[in-house]
Structure formats: structure tokens, C-alpha cells
Curated annotation (Swiss-Prot):
Cytoplasmic side: 28-346
Organism: Shewanella sp. (strain MR-7)
Protein's recorded name: Cell division protein ZipA
Intracellular or extracellular location(s): Cell inner membrane
Spans through the membrane: 7-27
Region listing for Disordered, in residue ranges: 76-103, 121-145
Family: Belongs to the ZipA family.
Amino acid sequence: MEDLQLVLFVLGAIAIVAVLVHGFWSIRRQQPKSLKDSPMGNFYKKQAERGEGAPKRVDADGFDADGIGAVRVRKANEAHTPEAPAFNPYLKQEAKTQPQPVEPVQVEPKPLFEQEPSMAQPDFSLQSPTAKEQHRGPKASRQEPVLQGHSANLAQAHVGQSHAAMVAQKVAEEQRAQVQMPTQTALFDDEEPYEEEQSQAVEQADDDLGEPRDVLVLHVVAKEGQQLNGAELLPCFLTLNFKYGDMNIFHRHVDNAGNGKVLFSIANMVKPGIFDPDNMEQFSTQGVVFFMTLPCYGDALMNFSIMLNSARQLADDIDAVVLDGQRQPWGEFTKQDYLHRIRANA
């Protein structure tokens, strides 16, 4: 048993040594051979030793059999002089002549139309009718009516008239400013007839309605012990197609978009009777007043119907009460009185 162990120990040692030797041999074989061990390492040295006494064969250009010539040393600061190109007899080079500057030729301008000596020079040029039309320029269009100014004299308020009626009277005076059509002289003799017809139509459409003879007033007031908040009034005004404008109050125009003539307006019932849209959230009042002047633009009965419906709609939205011009509850008797006043001033 001991002999078997000894044999195995020896075999293991031999195997280990064999593996180590094989590893070193593989590593050395994979490494590149140095210049010293390479077969071409001493090639140039031996060749030089053999040819020391023998003369080297050099061709006409100074190169030996291996293509090596004499070593030439050049200075670093030596200027490089370009060599002249060799002459090629097969290429014919033509001498280039520099073009001489040519003096500019002065051409005298000639008149487009030669005039005869006997004919006098006219002061104006003759042109065709078409040319006249082109030089005439655009015709001036009719100007829109210009508001001359607002009347400064307000009608005296009646005794006992409320502040809302006074505001309505003032706004009515502003809306009934005198409208005049400026007269414009014709620039040309061939003015078209249809332009005159259009001018007359505009003048008839913009005729002044005259001084207001009556004012229809409706109040929308808060219930007892309450007030109307500006944060609630502003969206209601916009929903009813009112637009903030002149006199710092809201107006209802012919067009729902806020264009055209003013039909009726809304003012603050408390002095000074104006609104500030930028501070409506901090604004509160006891009520607002609707007013319409007579005569008015369009159908007065239809305009009053729109104003009455707007007042009722506003009262329903903000939980308020509709009153007449004397701040009395709106009823059938008051309605008939307003209709009679509308017919009287139609």
C-alpha cells in the first residue's frame, strides 16, 4: 500500500512539472521574436562587412543596386527655390498678351422726339384720354357724418324728479348731438350720378331725431335690507347684450354685438350714476335704472318691450324688484301709461 502511494506521488510531481514546462513554452512561442533572434537581424551587418573592400556600383543618378543614394544634409532655414518646369516640346505654349484698357465710349443722349424748328414748344404734353384717367388718381370717397360736439345745455329737471331721470336726460342729450354732413366739392367733372344718390341716402338715414321729448324709466332695486353686488351685475349685463361705453354706463345697441345706434341704457341709481368695470367686485348699490329716450331709433314700442324684458330678466337673476319711474311697483296701469307716452311721441 505504501509503495502505491509513493508511485502516485511521483507521477503527480512529474505531471505538474510537465504542465509548467508546457506553459512556459507556449508563452515564449506566442511572444514576437526580437530583432536579435530574427534570421534577418544581422543581414545588413554581414552585408556591410562583406562589401567594405569592394566598390559600390552607382548609376548615373547616384543610386546603388538597392536604390540607396548618397546622404544629403539640408539646413532647416534654407529657402526652398522652386524648380523651373522642364520644357516639353510636345506642348506649344502660346504667349499671353495682357489686354489693354479700352476707353469708354461716351454716347450723347438723343431726344426721343425731334421737334421741328418752326413748331413752338407747348407748355403741356398731349396725352390720350386713357393716360388722363391714369394720372388723375383715385376719387375721394364720401366722408362719414362727423359729430360736431355734444350739446352742453341740459334740460332743467322737474321738481321731484329722481336722480335716475336726471342721468337719463343727460345721456339723451349726449346721444342727440347735432349731426351734419360736410359738403364736399367734386374733384372732377365726370362725377357719377349714383354717388350723389348714395350721399342722399346716407343723409336721410342719419337725420337728427331732434331734442328728446320724454324719457321712459324703469328701476331694478334690491329688496329691503339688501344690496346689489357688482360681481353679480356685470355678468348679467353682458348676458343681456349691454356694452360699456359713453358716460361710463352700459348701453344696449341695435346690434347684439354692441354696434349701431343706442336703444336704451343702464345707469347706477346712486350718485354719480356711473360704473367701474375694473372694480365691480368691490362695488355694491341699492339699484340700477333702465331709461330710453323718445323719440328713438327704430320701433319705439319694440325697443321698450326689449327694455322691459331685460329689466325683468335682471330682477329674476339677482332676486330684485322692478319699479317704474316713480319707484312704484310695476303694474298694468303703469304699463298702459307707458304705451300711451310711446304713441304720443312716435
